Amino acid sequence: MILRALVVVGLLTQAPAQMTRLPQFDNDRAVSWKSVIPAHTESTLLRHDRYRTIVAIVGGDLTLVGADGKKTVVHYETGKAYWQAPMPAGEMHKDANETGKTIELVVIEMK
């Protein structure tokens, strides 16, 4: 009985899941990272100044939340690659996973 109580308390006190960025490579031409975006998490405001390719390892619907609060849902299909241009000057957004599943993306950003 005590063991069960300790397990329950341990589960309740675990830190919430957070987005992680795992470096893949960095050279003169490009930098790459793997983004692991757990369910119901949100990044801080960010921007993309360079061209990039995004490969969906585990796809899903990622919500981009503009600094003005406007939401845009981007669907990433598992196994597909996507080309994205730099963001317009001054524009920023948050990445939000409002779904119940973790999304995993590899980003390759040109230098």
PLM feature spans:
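Histidine-centered metal-chelating micro-motifs
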Residues: 40-44, 80-95
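Glycine- and acidic-residue-biased ligand/ion/polar-headgroup-sensing regions
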Residues: 48-68
